[in-house]
């Protein structure tokens, strides 16, 4: 019995229920990662695996960076926990001050969470509460997009548009609608960067405004580049149209930048890259380079100030988490910002994007490739699905890549799209 077979036998009855995984398949054919360094993972047998997806779109600066590791070690040895409610610790305020200059113009305040899913649900609650404190409590409707991914909590799943993530859970949150996605193989296949066709799809939001009465809509949430569902790059002018419609009707625009942020497009935030400033931005992942769970919601100054109008002895936002602004996470975040700044990683993508684009599109003539999409250092290769076995070809590609020592990300929807980020 070889080592991997021995591991499989050990894992067969493991109590661990793995997330977003085919548990039975994995336990028969385990793919374990024992350590990491730089761009590579290492298996227990010592095989070197290229991390083609930056962990789960989060290890933007590479694995086990000494400056970040040292910051975490100092942090946990100094202050392992501090209550975030009615108390605080210096690193939370220091980290907020460190991030603030990187935010898009007009975005000034931040609320710390522990994950992208928490960031999304926090942003949705902030949007609803904002309208209520301004006397517009009738604005309760939330708008998402088909094929959108906004985490796995109830709010994020409800506004998300990936069928496989939604159907098992029933009705979820009420008062949610979706506009169409922008994926169009007929018009935009093999586009380099932003596709030319599809900006008019933003008008779906205007139609929903007319259907429901815009005064009932609280917020629209969208990923600037929809990554988890297969890398759908926004058509030219699309995000600008969404911003215009939201402004016209007093609807808050939320950018889910859990993946897009922290330099993946060559700017700290996708909002800067596209020149469209939302009202709220969600983030996580790269905020600590994936070392310690953390997320945040960034917001415009007027949103923050709307909550500051009540009595000073009142809690302005009855929301938060035990681990919000955790001191060790803040230490990791500060170490991460040091690495980003010292190595110019938030803007370096601009130097590499053309090389990455050419490399991705060089695979155009490979068997079964029906589309390649890219922007910045994000790309996806869409494969023709097998008849009667949607998703199988993409999973096979994922497994074979691992055997060839390359890590890939199988998308979370029902097409064959191995993604790279």
Predicted regions mapped to residue ranges:
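Conserved N-terminal phosphate-binding loop of PLP-dependent enzymes in the Aspartate aminotransferase
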Residues: 1-421
């Amino acid at each position: 019995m070889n080592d991997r077979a021995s591991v499989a036998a050990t894992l067969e009855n493991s109590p661990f229920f793995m997330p977003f995984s085919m548990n039975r398949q994995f336990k028969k054919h385990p793919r374990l990662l024992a350590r990491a360094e730089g761009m590579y993972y290492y298996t227990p047998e010592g095989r070197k695996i290229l991390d083609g997806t930056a962990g789960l779109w989060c290890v933007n600066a590479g694995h086990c960076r000494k400056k970040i590791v040292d910051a975490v070690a100092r942090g946990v040895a100094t202050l392992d926990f501090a209550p975030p409610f009615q108390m605080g610790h210096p690193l939370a305020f220091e980290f907020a001050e460190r991030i603030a200059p990187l935010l898009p113009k007009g975005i000034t305040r931040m609320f710390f969470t522990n994950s992208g899913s928490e960031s999304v649900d926090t942003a949705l609650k902030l949007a609803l509460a904002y309208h209520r404190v301004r006397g517009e409590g009738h604005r309760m409707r939330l708008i998402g997009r088909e094929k959108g991914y906004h985490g796995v909590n109830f709010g994020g799943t409800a506004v998300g548009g990936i069928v496989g993530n939604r159907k098992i859970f029933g009705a979820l949150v009420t008062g949610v609608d979706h506009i169409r996605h922008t994926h169009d193989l007929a018009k935009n296949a093999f586009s380099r960067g932003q596709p030319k066709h599809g900006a008019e799809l933003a008008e779906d939001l205007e139609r929903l405004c007319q259907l429901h009465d815009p005064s009932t809509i609280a917020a629209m949430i969208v990923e600037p580049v929809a990554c988890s569902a297969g890398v759908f790059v926004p058509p030219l002018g699309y995000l600008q149209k969404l911003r215009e419609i939201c402004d016209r009707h007093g609807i808050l625009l939320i950018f889910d930048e859990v993946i897009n942020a922290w330099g993946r497009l060559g700017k700290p935030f996708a909002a800067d890259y596209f020149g469209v400033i939302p009202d709220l931005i969600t983030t996580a992942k790269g905020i600590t380079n994936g070392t310690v769970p953390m997320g945040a919601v960034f917001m415009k100054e007027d949103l923050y100030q709307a909550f500051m109008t009540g009595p000073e002895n009142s809690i302005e936002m009855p929301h938060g988490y035990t681990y919000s602004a955790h001191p060790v996470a803040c230490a990791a975040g500060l170490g991460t910002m040091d690495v980003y700044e010292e190595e110019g990683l938030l803007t370096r993508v601009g130097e590499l994007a053309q090389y990455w684009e050419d490399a991705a599109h060089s695979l155009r003539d490979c068997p079964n490739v029906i589309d390649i999409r890219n922007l910045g250092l994000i790309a996806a290769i869409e494969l023709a699905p097998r008849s009667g076995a949607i998703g199988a070809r993409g999973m096979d590609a994922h497994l074979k890549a691992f055997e060839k020592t390359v890590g890939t990300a199988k998308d979370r929807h029902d097409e064959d799209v191995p993604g790279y980020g």
